[in-house]
Regions:
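Terminal accessory/anchoring regions of large secretory-pathway or extracellular enzymes
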Residues: 25-68, 75-77, 95, 335-518
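Short polybasic amphipathic segments
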Residues: 105-110, 325, 349, 497
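N-terminal export signals
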Residues: 1-24
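Acidic, contiguous internal or C-terminal segments within carbohydrate-active enzymes
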Residues: 221-270
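Solvent-exposed N-terminal domain segments of exported/luminal and surface proteins
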Residues: 50-193
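Extended, loop-rich substrate-binding clefts of extracytoplasmic carbohydrate-active enzymes
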Residues: 181-239, 358-370, 374
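Hydrophobic residues positioned within well-ordered beta-strands of beta-sheet architectures
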Residues: 105, 217-219, 230-234, 244-246, ...
């Protein structure tokens, strides 16, 4: 359920360039209304006390009947972008409704403290073959599928895509030089439990009209589903790493088994640690290659991602984490060899709590996938305690999208994880004996000679260590080689590994899970 729904919600974005938008309504229509974030929070709290109304503006049947190719043939007219002639650093374009996007959203522009609707018509879009443009002439759009903001991110004379909101509560952003990769969500409810997942959706957006030359943009959103109502404030700050500050007020209508805060959604098909079963010229295929968690005491946990044989869940108990995120550490084109997907340019995303989040855990869900069109990785924060009907929750955090968004460190980092059958080159393959090769690199290690009293700090659960070797490689990186026998194939083998000098960690902590074949 999770895999399919996630893929449907964001798969169209992965397909390529969309555009769209219209001019904001002129004059002062009757719908103009005073706006403040405080009032929006009160509104959503009041809505949470009543039943959920899933009704959205009804779409014309011709929109509902669009298939994938027809929907992709609809492109926005760039010259009709909102704020195009305002001298602003931002332009807004809309995604056309239809195909998978049968629930429309509404957009409002905030001017001088008042919210006015932004209206779109068929004139804002180009209806290309195989569609007949005449069938869409003069048509009004009762709502849109979502929108994206453009900004001169890479060069001063071109408005690049910066951030896009489309499908449920999904959105994604870019840092300088990036191409779209992983997505974020406003909230996730009951992800990877025995029952169905619930997908809250952003139903209305309110965007402050950006001042001429303004560096940042602020927008607000209403979030709703059967068991939740929420008010969100986003402050977007483009740059080498694009920062999105989030202030989320969440009100529960019903009990929730697993409340996921700051959810991240990504794709890992195969990599150097896990590529069994893929006959592909590309050495690696993934949006991100690991989960990083930064603890308040400075300890850094690095968990390489996998594409498991069956659903795999990992839980990392924390008390007010300093941050967590899905990273793409591998930046070498030769490691991907994909001139179209450009996986080496996919952004990492770092979540940094603005205020203490208290006790809870970071959860990582890894879901089997056989194609790169499926997003099969999820990571999010689960606060401690019950999420009961009538409860209120507020979380503020900073999202950092880019090549290296995480804080710097003096600790050496894991630069590769490789696996294969255990034993020697002459050994027969044994499904219950596996080799793990972990390489660490950093100044703290490169300055050490081969005779340094460096030692591994190693813990293995549900497995037995058969062989261990520590090697200094040319260039100053260090490699740990482990042969491990599995005690029970039905139980995952868990690893914790760091390198120590004088009983103190000088590397981040590598964590891994071996289940099934990998």
């Amino acid at each position: 359920m999770f895999l399919t729904a996630t893929a449907l919600a964001v798969g169209a974005l992965a397909g390529g360039a969309w555009t769209g938008s219209a001019e904001a309504s002129d004059g002062a229509p009757a719908e103009d209304q005073g706006f403040s974030f405080e009032a929006l929070v009160r509104k959503m709290k009041d809505k949470a006390s009543g039943a959920y109304d899933p009704h959205t503006p009804e779409l014309p049947q011709k929109f509902l009947d669009l298939d994938y190719d027809q929907h992709r043939a609809i492109r926005f007219q760039p010259e009709r972008a909102v704020w195009k002639d305002s001298g602003s650093n931002y332009r807004l374009q809309a995604f056309h409704p239809g195909w998978l996007y049968k629930e429309s959203v509404e957009l409002f522009e905030i001017v001088e403290g008042k919210a006015r609707p932004i209206h779109f018509t068929g004139a804002d879009f180009a209806y290309r073959k195989p569609l007949n443009p005449e069938e869409f002439e003069g048509i009004d759009l009762p709502g849109i599928a979502g929108f994206r903001l453009h900004h001169p991110l890479n060069t001063p004379d071109y408005f690049d895509e910066l951030i896009a909101f489309v499908g449920a509560s999904y959105f994604r952003a870019l840092g300088k030089g990036d191409v779209y990769g992983l997505s974020a969500r406003g909230l996730c409810i009951d992800t990877a439990i025995a029952g169905p997942e619930e997908f809250p959706r952003f139903t209305r957006f309110y965007l402050e009209r950006p001042e001429k030359g303004a560096a940042e943009l602020r927008l607000y959103a209403e979030l709703e589903s059967e068991r939740v109502a929420g008010a969100y404030r986003f402050t977007v700050k483009p740059g080498l790493n694009t920062i999105v500050e989030v202030d989320a007020h969440i009100f529960l209508r019903g009990d929730v088994e697993r409340l996921g805060i700051a959810p991240l959604t990504s794709m890992f098909l195969y990599g150097e640690n896990d590529r069994l079963g893929f006959d592909d010229y590309r050495p690696e295929v993934h949006d991100n290659d690991g989960l990083l968690i930064l603890r308040r005491n400075g300890q850094r946990l690095w968990r390489p991602l996998r594409n498991p044989d069956k659903l795999a869940l990992s839980f990392f108990g924390e008390r007010s984490p300093a941050g967590f995120g899905l990273l793409q550490r591998d930046r070498e084109f030769d490691h991907f060899q994909d001139t179209e997907a450009q996986y080496q340019r996919r952004p990492s995303l770092w979540i940094e709590p603005v205020k203490g989040w208290g006790r809870g855990h970071v959860m990582l869900a890894e879901i089997p996938a056989d194609k790169e069109i499926y997003d099969n990785i999820a990571a999010f924060w689960v606060p401690e305690g019950d999420a009961k009907a009538g409860s209120e929750h507020r979380f503020s955090y900073r999202m950092i999208w880019g090549r290296e968004p995480e804080p710097g460190t003096e600790l050496a980092q894991v630069i590769s994880t490789s696996t294969g059958h255990g034993g020697t080159a002459a050994s027969d393959a044994d499904p219950n004996l596996r080799k793990f090769v972990v390489e660490f690199q950093g100044k703290a290690l490169s300055e050490l000679g081969a005779d340094a009293p460096l030692k591994p700090r190693l813990t293995i659960q549900n497995g037995a260590l058969k062989h261990k070797q520590l090697q200094r490689l040319e260039g100053g990186s260090w490699r740990v080689v482990l042969d491990v026998a599995r005690e029970n194939a039905s139980q995952p083998v868990e690893f914790i590994l760091a390198l120590q000098l004088e009983d103190a960690d000088i590397t981040e902590t590598w964590m891994y899970q071996w289940s099934g074949n990998t």
